[in-house]
Swiss-Prot record:
The gene is RPLP0. Residues 285-315 are annotated as: Disordered. Residues 285-294 have a biased composition (Low complexity). Belongs to the universal ribosomal protein uL10 family. GO terms for cellular component: cytosolic large ribosomal subunit. The lineage of its organism: Eukaryota, Metazoa, Chordata, Craniata, Vertebrata. It comes from the Eukaryota. SUPFAM superfamilies: Ribosomal protein L10-like. Ribosomal protein P0 is the functional equivalent of E.coli protein L10. Keywords: Phosphoprotein, Ribonucleoprotein, Ribosomal protein. This is Large ribosomal subunit protein uL10.
Length: 315
């Protein structure tokens, strides 16, 4: 099959990205630094049936999106984030599920000289198995060692590289000698597009319980503020009613004004002991009946025992 010319390829690419933007309401903008073609193929296969990966030149992606803004103006929010080595992952599935699938497709990678470290790298205390001739190599990196049974032993954990630092040749060589692959590379989610809204991927970690807790906290804050300023809202009205009722009771107690519930409060304040004694009286009345029953049972058992004593072994 003859290869299509560049103009045809561009035209088909524009049609493809526009079709995907129309068919899929959600997508990720992903960074693809240090992702090789073999790993990309594995990612596509693992996402088959769940999501579609589309890579391309930033200028072409921007041009396709700008040409489609008349049909969907919300796509303009994507344009500021199309920079660097990025692509799209389109999906109709749950975003958190697809995110987890992308994370599962990261592969460990060795440190290369000149690469920017995506994370801190710490060399743990260990016996390296390397001969004493490598001691100067560790000393040059400021790593404290000792010779143990003819091999070099690192005495304590050492932070070799910090996030964002450029990996030096010595650091890369040491990590390779120790068979440490400190980095993992894959598609990194940079932004999330969901039905016209765009937000950072950290939002996907917010659970329903966290949302519920934040909502209740907001309701409590609103109720507190409204109570202080005397502004009625749905959140504050129940508290206002209770507080108002307490004030009415207090007023009734201090004046001659009364109503049935206030009468109970006045009676309690006049003679609290009447309410305290009422409960023990009921308990005291029940106590003799309860004690009488065991006494009766005990008497019956005693009579049965006496009857048994009347018969001898040879009667």
């Amino acid at each position: 099959m003859p290869r299509e010319d560049r103009a045809t390829w561009k035209s088909n690419y524009f049609l493809k990205i526009i079709q995907l933007l129309d068919d899929y309401p959600k997508c990720f903008i992903v960074g693809a630094d240090n992702v090789g073609s073999k790993q990309m193929q594995q990612i596509r296969m693992s996402l088959r049936g769940k999501a579609v990966v589309l890579m391309g030149k930033n200028t072409m992606m921007r041009k396709a999106i700008r040409g489609h803004l008349e049909n969907n103006s919300a796509l303009e929010k994507l344009l500021p984030h199309i920079k660097g080595n990025v692509g799209f992952v389109f999906t109709k599935e749950d975003l958190a599920e697809v995110r987890d699938m992308l994370l599962a497709n990261k592969v460990p990678a060795s440190a290369r000289a000149g690469a920017i470290a995506p994370c801190d790298v710490t060399v743990p205390a260990q016996n390296t198995g390397l001969g004493p001739e490598k001691t100067s190599f560790f000393q040059a990196l400021g790593i404290t060692t000792k010779i143990s049974r003819g091999t070099i032993e690192i005495l304590s954990d050492v932070q070799l590289i910090k996030t964002g630092d450029k990996v030096g040749a010595s650091e890369a060589t040491l990590l390779n000698m120790l068979n440490i692959s400190p980095f993992s590379f894959g598609l990194i989610i940079q932004q999330v597009y969901d039905n016209g809204s765009i937000y950072s991927p950290e939002v996907l970690d917010i659970t329903e319980d966290a949302l519920r807790a934040r909502f209740l906290e907001g309701v409590r804050n609103i109720a507190s503020v409204c109570l202080q300023i005397g502004y009625p809202t749905v959140a504050s009205v129940p508290h206002s009613v209770v507080n108002g009722y307490k004030r009415v009771l207090a007023l009734a107690v201090e004046t001659d004004y009364s109503f049935p519930l206030a009468d109970k409060v006045k009676a309690f304040l006049a003679d609290p002991s009447a309410f305290v004694v009422a409960a023990p009286v009921a308990e005291t009345a029940a106590a003799p009946a309860a004690s009488a029953a065991p006494a009766k049972e005990e008497k019956e058992e005693s009579e049965e025992s006496d009857d048994d004593m009347g018969f001898g072994l040879f009667d």
